[in-house]
Each structure stands twice: as C-alpha cells, then as structure tokens.
Curated annotation (Swiss-Prot):
NDH-1 is composed of 14 different subunits. Subunits NuoA, H, J, K, L, M, N constitute the membrane sector of the complex. Keywords: Cell membrane, Membrane, NAD, Quinone, Translocase, Transmembrane, Transmembrane helix, Ubiquinone. It comes from Bacillus thuringiensis subsp. konkukian (strain 97-27). InterPro entries: NADH_UbQ_OxRdtase_su1/FPO, NADH_UbQ_OxRdtase_su1_CS. It is an enzyme of class 7 (translocase). It holds the Pfam family NADHdh. This is NADH-quinone oxidoreductase subunit H.
Amino acid sequence: MIETLLQSPSSWTNFFIFFGLAVLLLFAVLGFVTYGILAERKVMGFMQGRIGPNQVGGRFGLLQTVADVLKLLLKEDSIPKAADKPLFILAPVIAFAPAFMVLAVIPFTDKFQFADIGVGLLYYIAVSGITTIGVVTGGWASNNKYSLLGGMRAAAQMISYEIPLVMSVIGIVLLAGSLNLNEIVAAQENVWYIFVQPVGFVVFLIAAVAELNRTPFDLPEAESELVSGYHTEYSGFRWAFFMLSEYVYFFGMASLITVLFLGGWNPVMFLGFIPGAVWFALKFSSVVFLLIWFRVTFPRIRGDQLMEFGWKVLLPIALANIFLTALIKELFF
C-alpha cells in the first residue's frame, strides 16, 4: 500500500494518509517508550535489591511513568534571563525530531516497516548524528558553564565513537552486499552475523553505548560533575524532549543491533513456527536487558579514558576487522 502511494501522483489524500501514519508512529513510540522507562526502572530496582516504582497504578507502579509525564507537562516552563532564547527553544526540537526519523527504516518484521530504502543503514547513522547538534546548541544557548561543558563533551564523544561505530558495520555490509536493512536480515537466514562478526559486534555495542551517552559513558550528563550536563537549565516539557530523545535512541539502537547482528525476525533453527515478530521482540528485549545491566554494573569512566579508548583501542580493532572480513570474503565466498 505504501509503495503504491509513493508512486502515485501527489495529492491531499496522500498527504493526510502519510501525516496520519506519522502521528500514529509518534504516539505508538511515545507509549512504548513510556512503559520502556518503567521497565528499566523495575529491572534496575531488581538488580539493586530494591522494589522500584510501586505507588502509582497499583503494586507494580504501572502508571508511574504516566504520572511523571503529566508532572513534566504541568511544570513551569522557565527560560534563563541570560539564555539565547531562540536557540534555547529550538535545541530540544533538533535533538528530538531525528530520534523518530531513524525509526522509519527499522524493519521490525518482513512486513512491518515504515520506509524500506536502499541505504537504510547509512540513513540511520547519518540522521542520528543530528541530535548532537541539538545537544551542543542547548548547552551553548543556556549560557551556563555546566551546560556548555556537557554539550562540548557530547560533541567530542560523538566524534570519537561515531567512527568506530561506522567501521564496525562495514564488515556486515561486505558480507551482505547491501546497505538495505531488509536485505541484511535476509542474509542472516542461515547464520546470524553475531557469530560471523563477533569482533564487529563487540565494537559496535561499546560504541553504541557511548553514542547513547549511557553509563559508563554518560559524561555529557555527569550529575556528580556537571549538575545535569547540557540540560541543566531545562525544565518541564523541554527537558522531557531531551529525555525522550535519549530513550527513543536507546530502543532504536537496540532494534538496530537486533537487525544487524541477531538476524532480526529470523527464527532459531527448528522453531520457525513461532512468528517473526515474537523472535524480534525476544532478541530486542535481550539487548535492552544487556544495556540496562551495563548501566547498573559499571562506574563512569574519566573523559581522557573515554577518548583514549575510542581512538587507540576501538578504531584500530574496527579497521583490523574490516581487513580480516574482506580477506575471508575474498578467499571463501
């Protein structure tokens, strides 16, 4: 249906159909992220020997995150007197919009994908980098030293880990022969790339955690050093924009790892009768659990250690993996 609409002449009907689909995607993702945050808090509570949210919405705290969202929407929207007002207002939008744009190319099943484009992997990596511009803009516009330091840290971290992230997936592109995410999943029908590209998987996972600014790489928001980092001066719904973009990317990156390394919706051998959507959900949940486990387990590292590890360790390993993959493909495939 979508392909037919894309090839048909432009009309107001097409506009309203795509606008409706975009709104549907927005609310579906926001609803999922809302309860995804609750799930993370519950898992962290379990790992730390706590109960977690249990006051709003019954003993399981099912409405806790909904209450948090309502609280943020009702809080006063304050803008510092010394801030650059236009940029201060624009920054959360710049950070927030790309987070939803990247989800359009993720194939959740062979039949459920919003946009099947030939360069889906390249599109995801390119668009996700725009968020850093919003983060740096927010830090600059706040006219606060802690916010500015947080924004500068975010930019330095993104530059340092974007390169290993891209290099780690070149091996997959060589093996699959495509940048299309659907074709990459189809190429893993017999064997998942986590077994063929274990080094690439480890490099991608570490670089992804750094890209997401999550522990142990959460230097842009380091509460013990920078109050709250680049969004120190933000409150209410503007702060919620930054928070939601972080969590949408969190779940988006988990989906991308599932597609690139875990075979997407492809089933385990002899269990093909289970629907592909179930397999995708199970793999996705495992990646999310692993990333939450990282957050609970590891302490924050120093800035110099972060930079040194990215440039001196991850990048050479990623380059060596490309060379080795090309050699194996040339000799055996």
